Amino acid sequence: MQPIRVVLAGATGKVGQVLARALVQEPGFALTGAIARQGGGRNLAELVPLGGRPGPTVHGSLEEFLAAGGEADVLVDFSVAEAGRRTIPAAIEASIAPVVGTTGFQPGETETWAAMCRKRGLGGAFIANYAVGIMLLMRFAEEAHRFFPDVEIIEMHHKTKLDAPSGTALRTKARLERGRGDLAAAEVPVHSVRLPGLVAHQEVIFGGLGQTLTIRHDAPSREAYVPGVLMTCRWVLREKRVAFDLEEVAFPRT
């Protein structure tokens, strides 16, 4: 069986480095390309510790990667929104399925790319958070909201995170607001914290008569995203469908 060929955008970023190490070690995967703003022409292993394994050549853009004869089945994009706006549609046009963890896009952008995927018969994923624990937090919170109408979200991240509120918090908020059925939920407040020493943390706090309930997820290591990304890469190639939530991948509806 041929390995899944991955080109990784944002390969030298904080999450990208973790994913690069995972992809060069994971059976059934081959990291065939790396895209980064700096280090073009160098081997990724010179820029990112890959555990002694060789890496692909770094390119400044997906177009450069393809022009150099690069081939990939999946684009994994954990870059920034500005770069993603160029890389993601280029990948789809090249029949490379996008698995996107980059956030900060304007409303409607991911829907446009999803439509492009469907038109070309490609799978794709535009998911704000690939941590399996966050997926379960949303699932549990949606269930709890049936019994606790009063709820607020607190999301806490490292000081350099660009978007606030986080894409994950906004996704959680949207699920809670639409998940109450006929109970007409009010808008769910979201509070953002950006401090040194934090990595990625989210709490959903419910209040009721004489009690509170807190559902919390902590990701002190960016390795938390690896299992979800690998699972989604397999899914987009197998199912050739588009997902906006990791739950759609982990718990597919027939």
From Swiss-Prot:
Q: Quickly give the catalysed reaction.
A: (S)-2,3,4,5-tetrahydrodipicolinate + NAD(+) + H2O = (2S,4S)-4-hydroxy-2,3,4,5-tetrahydrodipicolinate + NADH + H(+); (S)-2,3,4,5-tetrahydrodipicolinate + NADP(+) + H2O = (2S,4S)-4-hydroxy-2,3,4,5-tetrahydrodipicolinate + NADPH + H(+)
Q: Which Gene3D superfamilies match?
A: Dihydrodipicolinate Reductase, domain 2, NAD(P)-binding Rossmann-like Domain
Any one cellular-component term (Gene Ontology):
cytosol
Catalytic residues, per the record, are H157, K161
Share an example GO biological-process annotation for this protein: lysine biosynthetic process via diaminopimelate
State the top-level EC class.
oxidoreductase
Q: Enumerate the UniProt keywords alphabetically.
A: Amino-acid biosynthesis, Cytoplasm, Diaminopimelate biosynthesis, Lysine biosynthesis, NAD, NADP, Oxidoreductase
As recorded in UniProt, its EC number(s) are 1.17.1.8
Where in or outside the cell it occurs: the entry states: Cytoplasm
**Which residues of the sequence carry a binding annotation for (S)-2,3,4,5-tetrahydrodipicolinate?**
H158, G167, T168
For the keyword NAD, the answer is yes
List where the protein spans the membrane: none
Query: Which coarse location class describes where this protein primarily resides?
Result: cytoplasm
What's a single GO MF annotation on this record? NAD binding
InterPro entries registered for this protein in UniProt: DapB_C (IPR022663), DapB_N (IPR000846), DapB_N_CS (IPR022664), DHDPR_bac (IPR023940), NAD(P)-bd_dom_sf (IPR036291)
Metabolic or biological pathway, per its Swiss-Prot or TrEMBL entry: Amino-acid biosynthesis; L-lysine biosynthesis via DAP pathway; (S)-tetrahydrodipicolinate from L-aspartate: step 4/4
What residues does NAD(+) bind to?
G10, A11, T12, G13, K14, V15, G101, T102, T103
Q: Does the keyword Glycosyltransferase apply?
A: no
* Its job: Catalyzes the conversion of 4-hydroxy-tetrahydrodipicolinate (HTPA) to tetrahydrodipicolinate.
Query: Known HAMAP family for this protein?
Result: DapB
Indicate the family of this protein: Belongs to the DapB family.
Name the chain's protein: 4-hydroxy-tetrahydrodipicolinate reductase
Q: Which gene encodes it?
A: dapB
